[in-house]
C-alpha cells in the first residue's frame, strides 16, 4: 500500500492515473484522479450534483437543470472550499491538464461529457469578486 500525492502517477497497464490532492473540497483527504489517455477527470466531490437518474451523462438532461442542481450542490458542499477550488483550477491550468479534460466524472450526479460549462460555472461560483445582478 502506497499513499499518493499531487504529481504522482500510476501506470495501470498502459494507462496512466495522475493524482492531484484537493484537501477540503468537502473532505480533508479529497483528491482528483486524471486518466490521461482518456482525458477523464475523476473529481471526487467537485463538479457534482445531488441527483440520481438512470441515465448517467450530462447530454441526457437539460444543461439548465444540471447547472441549477450543480449550483445547489456547490452552495451546500463546496462553498467553504472555494479558496482551494480556485487553487486547484489554477493548478490544472498551470500543469496543462485543464485543456486535456474531455470528461469529468464526479462522485455525485451526472458525468460531464462536455465539461466546459461546469468548469466555467465553478470558476464563477468560486470567484471572490462580487458579480453584478
Stretches found by the model and what they are:
Residues 1-11:
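Active-site HxH/HxHxD metal-binding segment of metal-dependent hydrolases
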Residues 12, 35-37, 132:
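Short, surface-exposed, charge-dense and proline/glycine-enriched linear segments
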Residues 108-131:
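Terminal amphipathic helices with adjacent charged low-complexity linkers/tails
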Residues 16-114:
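Metallo-beta-lactamase
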Residues 1-3, 32, 70, 133:
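Generic preference for hydrophobic/aromatic residues in regular secondary structure cores
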